[in-house]
């Protein structure tokens, strides 16, 4: 059985060492707080007006300003800055926090589309940093897909991929 990092690498096409190249550079020091606020704001401005209703509905019960704050605080912390997210919300626990949402391959790709567009729209981020960030985002998106699938499977071990309950036949 593959571990979550291996699945994330396989599904995302991003090797773990490339996904975590962000740890070799303090992107918070390099880019600054305002850049992460701008990135998160730009990203969620796109998400909340997405053309696809199914994707918008994932975020419908979330306050946009809180989503922006949660994301930029997480990014600041993860990219080498102060632990803003943990101070306010506790451990990031990404899989657990995303479990209530339909974190699927399709949703991950849609999320990544908006993040790529947001990155492309922020001129304060240099090309190499954009590549590092996008590798991290792509790998992490599929890490979440794998983690949520695994958690859901452990809660419903007798459900197959189509939602049927094959164990009831015994």
Swiss-Prot record:
Pfam family name, one: Bac_globin
A single MF term (Gene Ontology): oxygen binding
Binding site for heme b: 98
Any Gene Ontology biological process: nodulation
Superkingdom of this protein's organism: Eukaryota
Keywords on record: Heme, Iron, Metal-binding, Nodulation, Oxygen transport, Transport
Keyword Heme: yes
Keyword Kinase: no
Record's note on what induces expression: Down-regulated by nitric oxide (NO), particularly during nodulation mediated by Sinorhizobium meliloti inoculation.
Role this protein plays: Hemoglobin-like protein that exhibits an unusual concentration-independent binding of O(2) and CO. Required for general plant development and during nodulation. May promote shoot organogenesis from root explants.
Protein family: Belongs to the truncated hemoglobin family. Group II subfamily.
Complexes and interactors: Homodimer when ferric.
Protein name: Group 2 truncated hemoglobin 3-1
Source species: Medicago truncatula
Organism lineage string: Eukaryota, Viridiplantae, Streptophyta, Embryophyta, Tracheophyta
